[in-house]
Amino acid sequence: LTTTTTEMLQAIQNGDLQKINSLFEYFLMNEEPEAQYEIADLFMQYGYLNEANRVYEHLQFIFPNEAQLSIDRASVLIELGEEDEALQLLMGIDNEAPEYPQSLLLLADYYQMQGLYEVAEQRINEALEIMPHEPLLKFAKAELLFETGRFSEAVRLYEELHEKEKNVAGVLLSTRLAEVYRAGGGYETALDYYMEALEEIVTPDLLFGSGYAAFQCEKFELAIKQLEDLKELDPDYFSAYLLLAESFAMLEDNKNAYKVILEGIKRDEYEKSFYLFAGKIALKNHLTDEAIDHLQQAIALDPEYMEAILVLMSIYAGEERYSDIIALYEDLKNEEFDWSALYPIVADAYSEEEQVNRAYEIYKLAYNEFKEDASFLSKYCYFLIEDGQRHEARKIALQLNALQPYEQQWLDLLDTLE
Protein backbone atom coordinates (compact mmCIF):
# COMPACT_ATOMS: atom_id res chain seq x y z
CA LEU A 1 0.00 0.00 0.00
CA THR A 2 1.16 3.53 -0.77
CA THR A 3 1.50 6.11 1.96
CA THR A 4 -1.66 7.93 0.80
CA THR A 5 -3.73 4.74 0.73
CA THR A 6 -2.43 3.77 4.17
CA GLU A 7 -3.28 7.19 5.56
CA MET A 8 -6.75 7.05 3.99
CA LEU A 9 -7.29 3.60 5.48
CA GLN A 10 -6.33 4.82 8.95
CA ALA A 11 -8.49 7.94 8.62
CA ILE A 12 -11.53 5.81 7.72
CA GLN A 13 -10.94 3.44 10.62
CA ASN A 14 -10.46 6.37 13.02
CA GLY A 15 -13.52 8.23 11.74
CA ASP A 16 -11.37 11.25 10.88
CA LEU A 17 -13.52 12.99 8.25
CA GLN A 18 -11.26 16.04 8.13
CA LYS A 19 -8.28 13.84 7.22
CA ILE A 20 -10.37 11.94 4.66
CA ASN A 21 -11.33 15.21 2.96
CA SER A 22 -7.75 16.48 2.92
CA LEU A 23 -6.53 13.27 1.23
CA PHE A 24 -9.47 12.70 -1.08
CA GLU A 25 -8.58 14.60 -4.27
CA TYR A 26 -4.95 13.47 -4.26
CA PHE A 27 -6.13 9.90 -3.62
CA LEU A 28 -8.46 9.99 -6.65
CA MET A 29 -5.89 11.52 -8.97
CA ASN A 30 -2.84 9.46 -8.04
CA GLU A 31 -3.70 6.05 -6.57
CA GLU A 32 -4.17 2.86 -8.57
CA PRO A 33 -7.77 1.89 -9.48
CA GLU A 34 -7.45 -1.37 -7.54
CA ALA A 35 -6.63 0.54 -4.34
CA GLN A 36 -9.41 3.02 -5.03
CA TYR A 37 -11.91 0.18 -5.47
CA GLU A 38 -10.89 -1.38 -2.16
CA ILE A 39 -11.15 1.97 -0.36
CA ALA A 40 -14.61 2.56 -1.90
CA ASP A 41 -15.75 -0.74 -0.39
CA LEU A 42 -14.29 0.33 2.95
CA PHE A 43 -16.12 3.66 2.71
CA MET A 44 -19.34 1.66 2.30
CA GLN A 45 -18.60 -0.54 5.30
CA TYR A 46 -17.96 2.47 7.55
CA GLY A 47 -20.98 4.42 6.31
CA TYR A 48 -19.16 7.06 4.25
CA LEU A 49 -21.69 6.76 1.42
CA ASN A 50 -21.04 10.06 -0.35
CA GLU A 51 -17.31 9.36 -0.43
CA ALA A 52 -17.93 5.82 -1.74
CA ASN A 53 -20.19 7.22 -4.45
CA ARG A 54 -17.53 9.72 -5.56
CA VAL A 55 -14.91 6.98 -5.83
CA TYR A 56 -17.21 4.68 -7.82
CA GLU A 57 -18.20 7.60 -10.08
CA HIS A 58 -14.52 8.32 -10.70
CA LEU A 59 -13.85 4.65 -11.51
CA GLN A 60 -16.84 4.54 -13.85
CA PHE A 61 -15.34 7.46 -15.76
CA ILE A 62 -12.15 5.43 -16.21
CA PHE A 63 -13.93 2.11 -16.92
CA PRO A 64 -17.30 3.10 -18.46
CA ASN A 65 -18.17 -0.45 -19.56
CA GLU A 66 -17.43 -2.18 -16.26
CA ALA A 67 -20.80 -3.61 -15.14
CA GLN A 68 -19.60 -4.40 -11.62
CA LEU A 69 -18.93 -0.71 -11.01
CA SER A 70 -22.48 0.13 -12.10
CA ILE A 71 -23.83 -2.42 -9.62
CA ASP A 72 -21.62 -1.19 -6.78
CA ARG A 73 -22.47 2.45 -7.41
CA ALA A 74 -26.18 1.66 -7.74
CA SER A 75 -26.05 -0.02 -4.33
CA VAL A 76 -24.58 3.17 -2.83
CA LEU A 77 -27.09 5.40 -4.61
CA ILE A 78 -30.00 3.35 -3.24
CA GLU A 79 -28.62 3.84 0.26
CA LEU A 80 -28.36 7.58 -0.45
CA GLY A 81 -31.97 7.73 -1.63
CA GLU A 82 -30.99 8.39 -5.26
CA GLU A 83 -33.14 5.54 -6.55
CA ASP A 84 -33.81 6.92 -10.04
CA GLU A 85 -30.12 7.19 -10.88
CA ALA A 86 -29.48 3.75 -9.34
CA LEU A 87 -32.23 2.15 -11.42
CA GLN A 88 -30.89 3.81 -14.55
CA LEU A 89 -27.48 2.26 -13.91
CA LEU A 90 -28.93 -1.19 -13.26
CA MET A 91 -31.24 -1.10 -16.26
CA GLY A 92 -28.25 -0.20 -18.43
CA ILE A 93 -26.44 -3.47 -17.73
CA ASP A 94 -26.47 -5.80 -20.73
CA ASN A 95 -28.43 -8.99 -20.13
CA GLU A 96 -25.55 -10.95 -21.67
CA ALA A 97 -23.07 -9.62 -19.13
CA PRO A 98 -21.83 -12.09 -16.48
CA GLU A 99 -22.87 -9.56 -13.82
CA TYR A 100 -26.47 -9.37 -15.08
CA PRO A 101 -27.89 -11.83 -12.48
CA GLN A 102 -26.23 -9.76 -9.75
CA SER A 103 -27.92 -6.62 -11.09
CA LEU A 104 -31.25 -8.45 -11.06
CA LEU A 105 -30.66 -9.42 -7.44
CA LEU A 106 -29.98 -5.80 -6.46
CA LEU A 107 -33.12 -4.73 -8.33
CA ALA A 108 -35.08 -7.40 -6.45
CA ASP A 109 -33.72 -6.10 -3.13
CA TYR A 110 -34.79 -2.58 -4.06
CA TYR A 111 -38.29 -3.61 -5.10
CA GLN A 112 -38.63 -5.74 -1.98
CA MET A 113 -37.73 -2.74 0.19
CA GLN A 114 -40.41 -0.76 -1.63
CA GLY A 115 -43.01 -3.47 -0.93
CA LEU A 116 -43.26 -4.41 -4.62
CA TYR A 117 -42.95 -8.11 -3.89
CA GLU A 118 -44.28 -9.46 -7.19
CA VAL A 119 -41.82 -7.36 -9.19
CA ALA A 120 -39.00 -8.43 -6.85
CA GLU A 121 -39.89 -12.09 -7.34
CA GLN A 122 -39.94 -11.64 -11.11
CA ARG A 123 -36.39 -10.28 -11.03
CA ILE A 124 -35.15 -13.14 -8.85
CA ASN A 125 -36.86 -15.72 -11.06
CA GLU A 126 -35.23 -14.16 -14.12
CA ALA A 127 -31.84 -14.44 -12.43
CA LEU A 128 -32.55 -18.06 -11.47
CA GLU A 129 -33.30 -18.92 -15.09
CA ILE A 130 -29.75 -17.83 -15.91
CA MET A 131 -28.11 -19.38 -12.81
CA PRO A 132 -30.56 -22.00 -11.46
CA HIS A 133 -28.10 -23.49 -8.97
CA GLU A 134 -26.70 -20.26 -7.50
CA PRO A 135 -27.12 -20.43 -3.68
CA LEU A 136 -27.32 -16.64 -3.27
CA LEU A 137 -30.25 -16.44 -5.68
CA LYS A 138 -32.09 -19.32 -4.00
CA PHE A 139 -31.47 -17.70 -0.64
CA ALA A 140 -32.76 -14.34 -1.89
CA LYS A 141 -35.95 -15.99 -3.11
CA ALA A 142 -36.38 -17.85 0.19
CA GLU A 143 -35.98 -14.55 2.06
CA LEU A 144 -38.64 -12.93 -0.11
CA LEU A 145 -41.03 -15.86 0.36
CA PHE A 146 -40.46 -15.77 4.13
CA GLU A 147 -41.12 -12.03 4.29
CA THR A 148 -44.39 -12.42 2.36
CA GLY A 149 -45.66 -15.24 4.56
CA ARG A 150 -45.23 -18.07 2.06
CA PHE A 151 -43.62 -20.24 4.67
CA SER A 152 -43.88 -23.68 3.07
CA GLU A 153 -42.24 -22.43 -0.15
CA ALA A 154 -39.52 -20.68 1.83
CA VAL A 155 -38.85 -23.82 3.89
CA ARG A 156 -38.35 -25.89 0.74
CA LEU A 157 -35.63 -23.54 -0.52
CA TYR A 158 -33.96 -23.07 2.87
CA GLU A 159 -33.83 -26.85 3.42
CA GLU A 160 -32.48 -27.41 -0.08
CA LEU A 161 -29.64 -25.00 0.73
CA HIS A 162 -29.19 -26.42 4.24
CA GLU A 163 -28.53 -29.89 2.85
CA LYS A 164 -25.37 -28.60 1.15
CA GLU A 165 -24.04 -25.83 3.39
CA LYS A 166 -24.50 -24.26 6.81
CA ASN A 167 -24.20 -20.60 5.81
CA VAL A 168 -25.31 -18.46 2.87
CA ALA A 169 -24.63 -14.72 2.63
CA GLY A 170 -23.34 -14.76 6.19
CA VAL A 171 -26.59 -16.22 7.51
CA LEU A 172 -26.72 -19.47 9.46
CA LEU A 173 -29.39 -21.48 7.63
CA SER A 174 -30.50 -23.40 10.71
CA THR A 175 -31.41 -20.00 12.21
CA ARG A 176 -33.58 -19.11 9.24
CA LEU A 177 -35.24 -22.53 9.27
CA ALA A 178 -35.99 -22.14 12.96
CA GLU A 179 -37.52 -18.72 12.34
CA VAL A 180 -39.65 -19.76 9.38
CA TYR A 181 -40.97 -22.90 11.12
CA ARG A 182 -41.75 -20.82 14.21
CA ALA A 183 -43.56 -18.21 12.11
CA GLY A 184 -45.58 -20.97 10.47
CA GLY A 185 -46.49 -22.61 13.78
CA GLY A 186 -44.22 -25.66 13.36
CA TYR A 187 -42.76 -25.31 16.83
CA GLU A 188 -41.35 -28.84 17.23
CA THR A 189 -39.26 -28.52 14.06
CA ALA A 190 -38.40 -24.92 14.89
CA LEU A 191 -37.06 -26.06 18.26
CA ASP A 192 -34.84 -28.68 16.60
CA TYR A 193 -33.34 -26.05 14.30
CA TYR A 194 -32.88 -23.57 17.15
CA MET A 195 -30.93 -26.17 19.11
CA GLU A 196 -28.84 -26.95 16.02
CA ALA A 197 -28.10 -23.26 15.52
CA LEU A 198 -27.11 -22.88 19.18
CA GLU A 199 -24.42 -25.50 18.67
CA GLU A 200 -22.80 -23.10 16.19
CA ILE A 201 -23.38 -19.76 17.90
CA VAL A 202 -25.12 -18.57 21.07
CA THR A 203 -27.02 -15.28 20.72
CA PRO A 204 -29.81 -13.72 22.78
CA ASP A 205 -32.27 -14.01 19.88
CA LEU A 206 -31.54 -17.71 19.40
CA LEU A 207 -31.94 -18.41 23.11
CA PHE A 208 -35.24 -16.53 23.18
CA GLY A 209 -36.46 -18.27 20.03
CA SER A 210 -35.61 -21.69 21.45
CA GLY A 211 -37.31 -20.80 24.74
CA TYR A 212 -40.43 -19.60 22.92
CA ALA A 213 -40.58 -22.72 20.74
CA ALA A 214 -40.06 -24.95 23.79
CA PHE A 215 -42.88 -23.11 25.59
CA GLN A 216 -45.22 -23.66 22.63
CA CYS A 217 -44.28 -27.36 22.64
CA GLU A 218 -45.15 -27.47 26.37
CA LYS A 219 -41.54 -28.30 27.20
CA PHE A 220 -41.56 -25.84 30.05
CA GLU A 221 -38.44 -27.11 31.82
CA LEU A 222 -36.42 -26.62 28.63
CA ALA A 223 -38.01 -23.20 28.10
CA ILE A 224 -36.93 -22.22 31.62
CA LYS A 225 -33.36 -23.40 31.00
CA GLN A 226 -33.05 -21.48 27.73
CA LEU A 227 -34.54 -18.32 29.17
CA GLU A 228 -32.43 -18.47 32.32
CA ASP A 229 -29.36 -18.74 30.07
CA LEU A 230 -30.63 -15.75 28.09
CA LYS A 231 -31.19 -13.72 31.26
CA GLU A 232 -27.61 -14.42 32.31
CA LEU A 233 -26.24 -13.55 28.85
CA ASP A 234 -28.31 -10.38 28.41
CA PRO A 235 -30.17 -9.17 31.52
CA ASP A 236 -31.78 -6.39 29.46
CA TYR A 237 -33.52 -8.74 27.01
CA PHE A 238 -36.87 -7.68 28.42
CA SER A 239 -39.09 -10.17 26.56
CA ALA A 240 -37.37 -13.03 28.36
CA TYR A 241 -38.83 -12.10 31.74
CA LEU A 242 -42.49 -12.47 30.83
CA LEU A 243 -41.97 -15.73 28.94
CA LEU A 244 -39.84 -17.14 31.76
CA ALA A 245 -42.45 -16.15 34.34
CA GLU A 246 -45.17 -17.74 32.21
CA SER A 247 -43.09 -20.94 31.97
CA PHE A 248 -42.83 -21.15 35.76
CA ALA A 249 -46.57 -20.48 36.01
CA MET A 250 -47.33 -23.35 33.63
CA LEU A 251 -45.49 -25.63 36.07
CA GLU A 252 -47.55 -24.05 38.89
CA ASP A 253 -44.36 -22.64 40.39
CA ASN A 254 -46.13 -19.39 41.14
CA LYS A 255 -43.53 -18.10 43.60
CA ASN A 256 -40.75 -18.21 41.03
CA ALA A 257 -43.10 -16.83 38.39
CA TYR A 258 -43.80 -13.83 40.62
CA LYS A 259 -40.12 -13.39 41.47
CA VAL A 260 -39.12 -13.34 37.79
CA ILE A 261 -41.80 -10.88 36.70
CA LEU A 262 -40.78 -8.52 39.51
CA GLU A 263 -37.22 -8.70 38.16
CA GLY A 264 -38.63 -7.83 34.75
CA ILE A 265 -40.46 -4.81 36.15
CA LYS A 266 -37.20 -3.55 37.68
CA ARG A 267 -35.59 -3.81 34.25
CA ASP A 268 -38.48 -2.25 32.31
CA GLU A 269 -40.89 -0.27 34.45
CA TYR A 270 -42.94 0.92 31.46
CA GLU A 271 -44.04 -2.47 30.09
CA LYS A 272 -47.74 -2.77 30.90
CA SER A 273 -47.92 -6.52 30.18
CA PHE A 274 -45.42 -7.13 33.01
CA TYR A 275 -47.76 -5.44 35.50
CA LEU A 276 -50.78 -7.36 34.18
CA PHE A 277 -49.02 -10.69 34.61
CA ALA A 278 -47.66 -9.61 38.00
CA GLY A 279 -51.22 -8.81 39.09
CA LYS A 280 -52.53 -12.19 37.99
CA ILE A 281 -49.68 -14.19 39.52
CA ALA A 282 -49.76 -12.18 42.76
CA LEU A 283 -53.39 -13.20 43.08
CA LYS A 284 -52.40 -16.86 42.70
CA ASN A 285 -49.90 -16.29 45.51
CA HIS A 286 -52.75 -14.88 47.65
CA LEU A 287 -51.21 -11.40 47.55
CA THR A 288 -54.37 -9.47 46.84
CA ASP A 289 -53.09 -6.01 47.77
CA GLU A 290 -50.01 -6.48 45.61
CA ALA A 291 -52.18 -7.73 42.74
CA ILE A 292 -54.33 -4.62 42.93
CA ASP A 293 -51.26 -2.39 43.01
CA HIS A 294 -49.75 -4.05 39.91
CA LEU A 295 -52.99 -3.78 37.97
CA GLN A 296 -53.41 -0.14 38.93
CA GLN A 297 -49.92 0.53 37.60
CA ALA A 298 -50.76 -1.26 34.34
CA ILE A 299 -53.83 0.95 33.93
CA ALA A 300 -51.79 4.05 34.81
CA LEU A 301 -49.54 3.20 31.86
CA ASP A 302 -52.52 2.58 29.57
CA PRO A 303 -55.87 3.91 30.84
CA GLU A 304 -57.68 1.79 28.22
CA TYR A 305 -55.87 -1.48 28.99
CA MET A 306 -58.97 -3.65 28.81
CA GLU A 307 -57.66 -6.90 30.24
CA ALA A 308 -56.08 -5.16 33.24
CA ILE A 309 -59.29 -3.20 33.89
CA LEU A 310 -61.42 -6.35 33.75
CA VAL A 311 -59.10 -8.31 36.07
CA LEU A 312 -58.94 -5.41 38.54
CA MET A 313 -62.72 -5.03 38.58
CA SER A 314 -63.10 -8.79 39.10
CA ILE A 315 -60.79 -8.58 42.12
CA TYR A 316 -62.74 -5.63 43.49
CA ALA A 317 -65.96 -7.61 43.04
CA GLY A 318 -64.50 -10.60 44.87
CA GLU A 319 -63.40 -8.30 47.68
CA GLU A 320 -66.81 -6.57 47.69
CA ARG A 321 -65.11 -3.24 47.04
CA TYR A 322 -68.07 -1.91 45.08
CA SER A 323 -67.23 1.76 45.52
CA ASP A 324 -63.82 1.11 43.91
CA ILE A 325 -65.53 -0.52 40.92
CA ILE A 326 -67.78 2.51 40.54
CA ALA A 327 -64.87 4.95 40.90
CA LEU A 328 -62.85 3.11 38.25
CA TYR A 329 -65.84 2.99 35.91
CA GLU A 330 -66.54 6.70 36.33
CA ASP A 331 -62.88 7.49 35.63
CA LEU A 332 -63.15 5.52 32.40
CA LYS A 333 -66.35 7.34 31.47
CA ASN A 334 -64.62 10.66 32.05
CA GLU A 335 -61.94 9.54 29.60
CA GLU A 336 -64.74 8.69 27.11
CA PHE A 337 -63.82 5.02 27.26
CA ASP A 338 -66.84 2.74 27.26
CA TRP A 339 -66.56 -1.05 27.21
CA SER A 340 -69.67 -3.21 27.39
CA ALA A 341 -67.82 -6.16 28.96
CA LEU A 342 -67.68 -4.15 32.20
CA TYR A 343 -71.42 -3.50 32.41
CA PRO A 344 -72.45 -6.58 34.45
CA ILE A 345 -69.79 -5.96 37.12
CA VAL A 346 -70.59 -2.24 37.22
CA ALA A 347 -74.34 -2.81 37.39
CA ASP A 348 -73.90 -5.23 40.29
CA ALA A 349 -71.68 -2.67 42.06
CA TYR A 350 -74.28 0.09 41.74
CA SER A 351 -76.93 -2.34 42.96
CA GLU A 352 -74.86 -3.32 46.00
CA GLU A 353 -74.28 0.37 46.76
CA GLU A 354 -78.07 0.85 46.54
CA GLN A 355 -77.78 3.30 43.65
CA VAL A 356 -80.83 1.69 42.10
CA ASN A 357 -81.50 4.06 39.21
CA ARG A 358 -77.89 3.94 38.06
CA ALA A 359 -77.82 0.15 38.43
CA TYR A 360 -80.98 -0.17 36.32
CA GLU A 361 -79.48 2.07 33.64
CA ILE A 362 -76.32 -0.06 33.40
CA TYR A 363 -78.26 -3.35 33.51
CA LYS A 364 -80.29 -2.18 30.52
CA LEU A 365 -77.10 -1.27 28.67
CA ALA A 366 -75.65 -4.69 29.46
CA TYR A 367 -78.77 -6.57 28.41
CA ASN A 368 -78.21 -6.36 24.64
CA GLU A 369 -74.72 -7.79 24.98
CA PHE A 370 -75.48 -10.44 27.62
CA LYS A 371 -79.04 -11.58 26.88
CA GLU A 372 -77.74 -15.11 26.26
CA ASP A 373 -75.74 -15.17 29.51
CA ALA A 374 -77.72 -16.99 32.21
CA SER A 375 -75.51 -15.70 35.04
CA PHE A 376 -76.11 -12.08 34.03
CA LEU A 377 -79.82 -12.62 33.40
CA SER A 378 -80.23 -14.22 36.83
CA LYS A 379 -78.72 -11.19 38.61
CA TYR A 380 -80.72 -8.82 36.44
CA CYS A 381 -83.94 -10.69 37.18
CA TYR A 382 -83.48 -10.63 40.95
CA PHE A 383 -82.51 -6.97 40.80
CA LEU A 384 -85.78 -6.21 38.99
CA ILE A 385 -87.75 -8.19 41.57
CA GLU A 386 -86.13 -6.27 44.43
CA ASP A 387 -86.87 -3.03 42.59
CA GLY A 388 -90.53 -4.00 42.28
CA GLN A 389 -90.45 -4.40 38.50
CA ARG A 390 -92.08 -7.82 38.50
CA HIS A 391 -93.52 -7.61 34.99
CA GLU A 392 -90.08 -6.95 33.49
CA ALA A 393 -88.54 -9.56 35.80
CA ARG A 394 -90.98 -12.15 34.43
CA LYS A 395 -89.74 -11.47 30.88
CA ILE A 396 -86.18 -12.15 32.01
CA ALA A 397 -87.30 -15.29 33.88
CA LEU A 398 -88.92 -16.57 30.67
CA GLN A 399 -85.62 -16.06 28.87
CA LEU A 400 -83.80 -17.93 31.61
CA ASN A 401 -86.23 -20.81 31.32
CA ALA A 402 -85.72 -20.88 27.55
CA LEU A 403 -81.95 -20.92 28.00
CA GLN A 404 -81.99 -23.55 30.78
CA PRO A 405 -85.27 -25.49 30.56
CA TYR A 406 -83.82 -28.20 32.81
CA GLU A 407 -83.43 -25.78 35.74
CA GLN A 408 -86.39 -26.12 38.13
CA GLN A 409 -85.54 -22.80 39.82
CA TRP A 410 -86.69 -20.81 36.76
CA LEU A 411 -90.03 -22.60 36.70
CA ASP A 412 -90.42 -21.92 40.41
CA LEU A 413 -89.47 -18.28 39.84
CA LEU A 414 -92.05 -17.96 37.08
CA ASP A 415 -94.71 -19.41 39.37
CA THR A 416 -93.76 -16.85 42.01
CA LEU A 417 -94.02 -14.02 39.50
CA GLU A 418 -97.46 -15.07 38.20
Summary of predicted features, one role per range:
Residues E38, D72, L106, A140, ...:
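Canonical tetratricopeptide repeat
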Residues Q13, Q45, E79-L80, M113, ...:
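Register position in tetratricopeptide repeats
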Residues M29-N30, I62, N95-E96, I130, ...:
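Structural marker of alpha-solenoid helical repeat scaffolds
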Residues E32-E34, A67-Q68, E99-Q102, P135-L136, ...:
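Helix-start (N-cap) detector for alpha-helical repeat units in TPR-like alpha-solenoids
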Residues Y26-F27, H58-L59, G92-I93, E126-A127, ...:
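Canonical positions in the second alpha-helix
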Residues D16-L17, L49, E83, Y117, ...:
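TPR-repeat structural position
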